[in-house]
Design a protein with these regions (language model features):
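PLP-dependent amino-acid enzyme catalytic core
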Residues: 1-237
Length: 237
């Protein structure tokens, strides 16, 4: 068992399975609409240096595991962020900046989401404040600072950094771009999720193979939700 902070311990013992799983396409697209997903692609595909990231076939791993095909979507090639979360935060920044001019962007992050938000603000000439917990490495902080953001380190864990972000954003009238939805905050997270759906749009054009499983890392679940929405939109099987 590894301790990550002063009061919480985590232990990984087994894979978890959702016994109530049901892929309801209409239900999914009622949450993240087909229009929002389409708008995300139409916007991002016009960005400078946009191109599909590679879909690599892992031949050796296929053979060793005796599977038909394993593909790897290499998001490290997305723009110049070297991050698997380049799409969502930057797209949300662009959308909200069209409704409000000369805004200051803020966000709490453990690394990758904040990098996208910072880059999204930089490309539009906006100020950006990124909040991180004391556990975020200096390397990640430097990657965020490369895109011109002010990084505020907060004592405690991610929740503490998020609470501080909310408090100071309200006080200073900053605009929060977060990938976590709450009761009164869902539009911006939906935009963020829609940005990630582009990965599935690209995959649908990069292979004709029947995709049976998709594996991805997930924290708060924004990217995972965006991928599921992309599957509902672009995979018809």
């Amino acid at each position: 068992m590894k301790s990550f902070d002063s009061y919480r311990k985590w232990k990984y013992t087994k894979f978890l399975s959702n016994k109530n799983y049901s892929f309801n396409r209409n239900y999914i697209l009622n949450i993240i609409s087909s229009k929002i997903i389409t708008d995300a692609f139409n916007s991002i595909s016009k960005w400078k240096n946009y191109k599909k990231t590679p879909l690599l076939k892992l031949e050796k791993l296929n053979k060793n595991l005796k599977l038909n095909n394993i593909f790897y979507k290499d998001e490290s090639k997305r723009f110049h962020l070297k991050s698997f979360k380049a799409l969502g935060g930057a797209y949300a920044v662009e959308k909200i900046s069209k409704k409000k001019k000369n805004i200051i962007i803020s966000s709490a992050t453990a690394g990758n989401h904040g990098r996208s938000v910072a880059w999204g603000a930089q490309r539009l000439g906006l100020q950006c404040k990124i909040f991180v917990s004391q556990y975020v490495s200096e390397e990640r902080v430097k990657e965020i600072e490369k895109f011109g953001a002010d990084v505020i380190r907060v004592k405690g864990n991610y929740e503490n950094s998020l609470n501080e972000c909310k408090k100071l954003s309200k006080k200073n009238n900053w605009n929060i771009v977060q990938d976590v939805s709450t009761k009164n905050y869902s539009y911006v997270p939906l935009l963020t999720m829609a940005g990630y759906s582009i990965m599935i749009k690209e995959i649908s054009k990069q292979t004709t193979h029947y995709i049976t499983h998709i594996f991805l890392q997930a924290g708060v679940g924004g990217m995972a939700a965006g991928v599921v929405a992309g599957v509902a939109k672009y995979f018809k099987r």
